[in-house]
């Protein structure tokens, strides 16, 4: 699944090369051999539309990798079970801030000098 923002993604990207791909976009686009497009509605949030699409197809698992804005939308709507956050030694003074989780971490692991924090959504049980 790809969530496309205001700008179209190049069809030369690896995600469009051979495997079936679904693109959620605010623009209508014609389907191709391996790519189908789902038009996002303004009536329902993007995370809910993605989850409804997956539910209708009996897909029970989704890993969200993406920009901070996409991640924050899923987090803000409570549509997450688990988050894994790596924290390294480097600090950045500029750039896009990571999404915020207000829950305490459940566990932390040292992975080759970096730390992996695991969070569970308390609402999901």
Positions of PLM-derived features:
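Extended hydrophobic-aromatic, low-complexity segments
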Residues: 62, 94-95
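Active-site ligand-binding patch in enzyme domains
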Residues: 1-60, 69-72, 125
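Conserved histidine-centered catalytic loops in small-molecule metabolism enzymes
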Residues: 95-125
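Well-ordered beta-strand positions
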Residues: 22, 82-84
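Helical hairpin unit composed of two closely spaced alpha helices linked by a short loop
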Residues: 59-62, 66, 84-86
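Short acidic amphipathic segments
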Residues: 74-82
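Small/polar glycine-rich anion-binding or flexible loop at a beta-alpha turn
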Residues: 66-73, 89-92
């Amino acid at each position: 699944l790809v969530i496309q923002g205001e700008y179209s993604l190049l069809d030369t990207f690896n995600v469009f090369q051979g495997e079936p791909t679904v693109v959620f976009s605010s623009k209508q686009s014609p389907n191709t051999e391996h790519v189908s497009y789902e038009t996002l509605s303004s009536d329902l949030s993007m995370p809910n539309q993605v989850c409804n699409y997956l539910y209708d197809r009996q897909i029970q698992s989704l890993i969200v990798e993406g920009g901070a804005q996409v991640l924050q939308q899923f987090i803000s709507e409570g549509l997450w079970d688990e988050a894994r956050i790596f924290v390294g030694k480097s600090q950045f003074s500029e750039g896009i801030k990571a999404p915020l989780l207000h829950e305490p971490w459940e566990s932390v692991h040292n992975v080759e000098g970096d730390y992996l924090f695991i969070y569970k959504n308390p609402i999901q049980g």
